[in-house]
Amino acid sequence: MSGFDNLNTDFYQTSYSIDDQSQQSYDYGGSGGPYSKQYAGYDYSHQGRFVPADMMQPQQPYTGQIFQPTQTYTPTTPQPFYGNNFEDEPPLLEELGINFDHIWQKTLTVLHPLKVADGSIMNETDLAGPMVFCLAFGATLLLAGKIQFGYVYGISAIGCLGMFCLLNLMSMTGVSFGCVASVLGYCLLPMILLSSFAVIFSLQGMVGIILTAGIIGWCSFSASKIFISALAMEGQQLLVAYPCALLYGVFALISVF
């Protein structure tokens, strides 16, 4: 036993005591801790500079109740991109500017030269009827063995441009190019009758010359009457009818020869 006591005495230092351990305890709340030497230079008070400014603003408290929206919230239904009611949409022909009633009235005005023309209807830009009449005129020439579609459209374009310049110089209100093309195209309808006669009969005799002169006068008189009523050019019908007669005379020459 004496040997065991000597071993314990050698293992433990005689100067060690619990009081010494309490003196070596670290004060972690102060600046004398073991970690204060390594991180003493870092200032934690500057961490707020990395926070965005919008996050630092105080948020508005929610004043509503559970399952009840606030008074400022007004729910709205999303608006659809396309209309749900197709009945409110205008017809396709109306969107394209094709009115069969006005086309029929303009056609009757051309077929009845003595009928008073409606200036409000004739002042519209309607090219559906003139395109059909130009195609019909070219088709009747084709039945007679004359392929003249290029001449028909070319002469029509040049004639419309010339009448457009002339009417703008003569009238006080002015006129659009579409209106001039529409009126001249509708007044081409009697010329279709002349080209239809040329399919069956020859127009190079005396009867053909008289018929051709009558058709030219018919077309030019109808066109001048419509221009006078649409542009309020009273007393100038003969001045307008003369260039119209020159234009329709070219179409008559194509039909006869």
Swiss-Prot record:
Interaction with Sec23 as annotated region, ranges: 75-106
Keywords: Cytoplasmic vesicle, Endoplasmic reticulum, ER-Golgi transport, Golgi apparatus, Membrane, Protein transport, Transmembrane, Transmembrane helix, Transport
Example of a GO cellular component annotation carried by this entry: endoplasmic reticulum exit site
Family: Belongs to the YIP1 family.
Segments on the Cytoplasmic face: 1-124, 168-173, 218-236
Superkingdom to which the source organism belongs: Eukaryota
Organism in which the protein naturally occurs: Bos taurus (Bovine)
Lumenal membrane side: 146, 195-196
Subcellular location: Endoplasmic reticulum membrane; Golgi apparatus, cis-Golgi network membrane; Cytoplasmic vesicle, COPII-coated vesicle
Function in brief: Plays a role in transport between endoplasmic reticulum and Golgi. In pancreatic beta cells, required to transport proinsulin from endoplasmic reticulum into the Golgi.
Membrane-spanning parts: 125-145, 147-167, 174-194, 197-217, 237-257
Lineage, uppermost ranks: Eukaryota, Metazoa, Chordata, Craniata, Vertebrata
Coiled-coil annotated spans: none
Presence of the UniProt keyword Ligase in the record: no
Quaternary structure and partners: Interacts with the COPII coat components Sec23 (SEC23A and/or SEC23B) and Sec24 (SEC24A and/or SEC24B). Interacts with YIF1A. May interact with RAB1A. Interacts with YIPF3 and YIPF4.
Name this protein carries in UniProt: Protein YIPF5
